[in-house]
């Protein structure tokens, strides 16, 4: 009997502290015998990683940026995510489409209707039920005030073009995440990221346990 795959994404503005908890959750799933695929967006495949470098570092308009992100996502889905889910893996992805709506949409002001069209087109999966659009089974959103995120990023490693944006940009991005959660609340677990690391981890763990995926 094949174990059903699970797709979990992790979202939040830069500085929210996702990475530590992604690794911890991977360990928790593996401890219960599950195969785990760790990945990220943009990226996850050789082609998508090349596009990631362009998106994070090169100057371009919002449309070019969005198209590159969705091109990377299509390759990521076809080459990595869908095969992993078909094997029954737990796929843990650092950012997915919600980030595109938050960063390119709310942050950069790109047309949300076009993003919705790209989401439907790029994330439709052949062979599954009609009109199926691949999105995570659970999205863990690390909600952090923009000003606190800016403090965390100050003096860190050399920032990419998004990390170097002003606080107001991250306020818009946070609003974009809130709008996505409001549109699909059952998919989201909102985590207060301005807590101790252990408190944040407990909230993440409880969100996954509530779905019956960990004991």
Swiss-Prot record:
Recorded GO cellular component terms are: cytosol
Superkingdom of the source? Bacteria
Query: What GO biological process, any one, is recorded here?
Result: dTTP biosynthetic process
Where does the chain bind ATP? Answer: 12-19
Q: What is its EC number?
A: 2.7.4.9
Q: Which UniProt keywords apply?
A: ATP-binding, Kinase, Nucleotide biosynthesis, Nucleotide-binding, Transferase
One MF term in the entry's GO annotations:
dTMP kinase activity
Question: Top EC class per UniProt?
Answer: transferase
Which reaction(s) does the protein catalyse, per the Swiss-Prot or TrEMBL entry?
dTMP + ATP = dTDP + ADP
Give a Pfam family name: Thymidylate_kin
Q: What does this protein do?
A: Phosphorylation of dTMP to form dTDP in both de novo and salvage pathways of dTTP synthesis.
Entries under PANTHER family matching the protein:
THYMIDYLATE KINASE, UMP-CMP KINASE 2, MITOCHONDRIAL
Q: Which family does it belong to?
A: Belongs to the thymidylate kinase family.
This protein's name: Thymidylate kinase
**Organism listed in the record:** Albidiferax ferrireducens (strain ATCC BAA-621 / DSM 15236 / T118) (Rhodoferax ferrireducens)
Gene from which this protein is expressed: tmk
């Amino acid at each position: 009997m094949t174990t059903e795959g699970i797709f979990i994404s992790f979202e939040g503005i830069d500085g929210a502290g996702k990475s530590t908890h992604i690794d911890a959750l991977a360990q928790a799933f593996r401890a219960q015998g599950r195969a785990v695929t760790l990945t990220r967006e943009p990226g996850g495949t050789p082609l998508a990683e090349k596009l990631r470098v362009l998106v994070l570092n090169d100057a371009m308009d919002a449309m070019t940026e969005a198209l590159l992100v969705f091109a990377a996502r299509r390759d990521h889905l076809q080459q990595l995510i869908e095969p992993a889910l078909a094997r029954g893996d737990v796929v843990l992805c650092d950012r997915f489409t919600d980030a595109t709506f938050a960063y390119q949409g709310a942050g950069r002001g790109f047309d949300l209707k076009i993003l919705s069209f790209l989401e439907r087109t790029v994330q439709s999966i052949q062979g599954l039920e009609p009109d199926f659009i691949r999105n995570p089974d659970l999205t863990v959103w690390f909600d952090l005030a923009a000003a606190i995120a800016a403090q965390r990023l100050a003096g860190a490693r050399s920032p990419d073009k998004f990390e170097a944006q002003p606080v107001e940009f991250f306020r818009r991005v946070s609003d974009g995440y809130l709008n996505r959660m409001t549109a699909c609340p059952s998919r989201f677990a909102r985590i207060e990221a301005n807590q101790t690391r252990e408190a944040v981890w407990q909230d993440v763990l409880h969100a996954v346990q509530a779905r019956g995926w960990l004991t």
